[in-house]
Amino acid sequence: MIFVSCTQDSDWIYLFDGKDVKGLRGYKMEEFPLDSWLIKDGNLKTIPEKKGVDLITEDTFENFELELEWKLQSGGNSGIFYFASEQGDYIWQSAPEMQVLDNIGHQDRLKKVTSAGALYDLVAPSKDMVNPIGNFNKVKIISKNRKVEHWLNGEKIVEYVAGSNHVQELISKSKFSKMPLFFKSYHGHIGFQGDHGEVWYRNIRVRKL
């Protein structure tokens, strides 16, 4: 299944264009966490020696297309969240996550369901599409009428239907079964994990479908 969008370029909302951050703030914060993230060389990156803070969009999304690029340091780990609420203390208590990972140097590589591109701890990617450390990886996430796709470096690697019996069964067998807020909504904030070490993001844009 491939979604084709006919929307214009003007429909894109640039959350980060290499110079400015727009429409992003800290999780459970009113402002952008300047002490935890900085803009450098056209990238939005964490400051690892500072307290990590996750980012979320000011707006919420249900049917959307998200595009961005990421890279990590060796052994790095991060994540891209969607359908997030701010009811819990942490974003991962409510939001499903596309895993961002060094598939060579991080222990989460040992399980496919926690490797790069996975619907974290639920749906494994169909193939390993991660570029070598030091190179950026292109991501696309599409959500349309609860059908969700994860794309990495031009390949669709995850596809599922949010709220389906299959996904609910996977959740029931995972650690998320003990989290009452997890994946209860199919509309929410998009987020970026900032408390797992150094990560670089760039060219972050989203549009509603």
Place the predicted regions along the sequence by residue.
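Bacterial N-terminal signal peptides
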Residues: 1-2
